[in-house]
A protein has these predicted regions:
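Aromatic- and acidic-residue-enriched segments that line the glycan-binding/catalytic groove
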Residues: 19, 23, 39-63, 123-143, ...
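Long, low-complexity, polar/charged, intrinsically disordered or flexibly structured peripheral segments
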Residues: 71-78, 235-256
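Active-site-proximal helices and loops of the catalytic beta/alpha 8
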Residues: 176-184, 194, 202-209, 264-265, ...
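N-terminal structural segment of carbohydrate-active enzymes
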Residues: 11-185, 193, 256
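An active-site-proximal structural segment forming one wall of the substrate-binding cleft
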Residues: 104-110, 114, 168-182, 200-221, ...
Length: 372
């Protein structure tokens, strides 16, 4: 009994331990679409804009040149007469995985030893925070966008045994290998509070209505009545943003089949060849809007991740308690060793802004000390 208790205690402490490598990490964050265009042959096209805001079909469109003035409208942007902020959402620069690989030596020379990638999973948006799927890297980040689509369409999204590796996936796995060959680490963004409108399960609900087996994945307020000309389909989006359908939860977090899907995603990217050695996989996750997902789910998520890779690092985005009044969460409940190793420290950033950037309402050193 004593041996069993000691063993359980050791397992619990291993799960709670922050990986040593993370404590000395010098991070570099990469927004893939805007980092470097390493392969112009895979650049987004006018067709790849479909499925994200703005939804208007464009008669003309082109990749934005990297060195152009951010506020300068391109000829095609001037023709649609919609202004800067509308067109900024349509812009694509062609950044991709090859572009990241090309600059790894440069990053290493800077002293970087850990990379955090904003979302890389398939998505119509430039930011990729509204996923179309989690099982594949965005096809415009890899060398064969058309071939990747053929592979997606041959799979059962719920059955990992049917999942294959696309050209974009394989290039991403090469990126992981190249990162590890330089004694660097890599983590990726996990967005599991919401998805994009083209997400495969949401589209199934949209097409089949109440007959869809994925109805309980989302917060559906009303289904469409085919007997009427109106579309009554209504659902909840993240912070009311209907571009990002929100995942349903109860007091324990998302439902069982969604959890099983995410568990399979964790295993896929944590140990791609499934041999029990996680050295070919990612080194952790940054979890988006983590405070909006139940802690019970994140406790399970941590166990899944650490079962695959005991040295994996988890950091959560724990941000607004009251968005309208700029009140942020105290992140302590997420940092007890059973959920995250760290959080995105927005409270620190906010204090720095108030002390050193905000000249109008600049706080005093004593006030900064209190905030810290």
């Amino acid at each position: 009994m004593l041996v069993w208790l000691l063993r359980c205690s050791s397992v619990q402490s291993d799960i709670a331990k922050v990986p040593e490598w993370a404590q000395d990490a010098i991070w570099y964050q990469i927004f893939p679409e805007r980092f470097r265009n390493g392969d112009p042959s895979n650049d987004p096209t006018i067709e790849t804009l479909e499925g994200t805001w703005p939804y208007d079909k464009q008669s003309e469109w082109a990749i934005t040149p990297w060195t152009d003035d951010w506020y300068k409208l391109q000829p095609w942007e001037e023709k649609n007469a919609q202004g800067f902020y509308y067109n900024a959402q349509l812009r694509r620069y062609g950044g991709d995985i090859q572009g990241i690989i090309d600059k790894l030596d440069y990053l290493q020379e800077l002293g970087v030893n850990a990379i955090y990638l904003n979302p890389v999973f398939e998505s119509a948006s430039s930011h990729k925070y509204g996923a179309t799927m989690y099982r594949h890297i965005d096809n415009n980040f890899g060398p064969d966008p058309a071939g990747d689509i053929e592979i997606w369409n041959s799979e059962n999204p719920t059955d990992p045994l049917t999942w294959q590796w696309t050209a974009a996936d394989r290039l991403f796995l090469k990126l992981i290998d190249e990162v590890h060959a330089r004694d660097m680490k890599i983590i990726i963004d996990g967005v599991f509070n919401h998805v994009g409108i083209p997400f495969w399960a949401f589209q199934d609900v949209r097409q089949k209505g109440r007959q869809s087996e994925y109805c309980d994945w989302f917060i559906i307020k009303s289904f469409d009545d085919p007997a009427t000309p109106e579309d009554e389909f209504e659902y909840q989006g993240w912070y009311g943003v209907t571009d990002l359908p929100e995942i349903w939860e109860d007091e324990n977090g998302p439902g069982q089949t969604f959890r099983e899907h995410i568990h399979n995603i964790v295993k896929r990217w944590g140990d791609p060849n499934g041999d029990g050695d996680p050295s070919d996989g990612i080194d952790g996750w940054r979890l988006d809007v983590a405070e909006m997902v139940r802690k019970e789910f994140w406790r399970d998520f941590r166990k899944w991740v650490r079962d695959v890779n005991p040295e994996a690092y988890l950091t959560g985005e724990v941000w607004w308690k009251d968005f309208h009044n700029n009140v942020m969460f105290n992140a302590a409940p997420w940092l007890q060793g059973d959920i995250f190793d760290a959080v995105m420290n927005y409270r620190f950033a906010d204090a720095m802004l108030k002390a050193f950037v905000d000249k109008k309402d600049q706080i005093k050193p004593s006030q900064l000390d209190k905030l810290l």
